[in-house]
Amino acid sequence: MAYQQLRNAVLAGAALTLGACGGGGGGGTNFIPSPPVTPAPEPPPPPPPPPPPVPSTANVFPGLTQSTQFAATGYESGGSSGNDMSVRYDASTGDYIFDLPSAEPGRFSPQYNAWSGAIVDSSGTVSTGMTIQDPTALELTYTTFARYSPTNGYIPSGYVAFGSATPEGAVPVTGSASYTATLAGGSPGGDLVVLDGTAALNFDFGAGTLSGSLDASLSGEWNGAGPYHFDFVNTVFSTGSTSFSGQLSSTGVQGMGSFDGRFTGPNAQELMGRWQIPYVDWWGNGGSAIGVFVGHKQ
């Protein structure tokens, strides 16, 4: 009797356990997991800001407040020299006016950015593309240069350096100073351009003497020349003079080069000029490179 009562109690407990767990086919509730939550898509990034508008006029020398006729010098591939070049600033319009041998006089009109554009004549005709060098990039205040070429071609046909000429009587007449300059230029045909070029000019103002050197390498798509080192020889400079000139001699190439220039800035703080050097390219062909230089006192 006791055994039968114990057996019934165990069976009853097992039945209760199975019912509570939903086993044995009972009516328990099955667990159904919730579906995963899909995160909201991230908002698209904002569009890039529009490029700054191209200015209508150049601001080459921001300190200018009145119309100015600059000193100008350079070379064109056709052989024209700086005597045929003129650059001036028109304060009434804010325009820089270029008069070059290969183009009608016209204003520089920025088209791609503040420094790259074209010369537009009085009739609105564009005949010459031009890029002006930002003077601040060369640590200059009163001087810079420009490359220009016909609008139907990309090869530079000319280089012009321009700036505010040092007045007579403002060049020091005592002491000495060294200037460092940057070169721009290439072969007249445009297949070679200056890859790297500098000049060092050392003036003894009291003695009226000039010494220095010019270094240049030329490079093209399939050609090149140099590097060349030229020493100044037969220099011409006198005490108080605003201009200077000389020849260029190198042991690396036959023939002589030449240069001439002038001081710029109120007290000869800067200078500019033009140069011409002989070269022999990688294929053994001789030629003559032309260009300009601009620099400042060290």
Kindly give the residue locations of the regions a language model identified.
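Bacterial N-terminal signal peptides that target proteins for export
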Residues: M1-V10
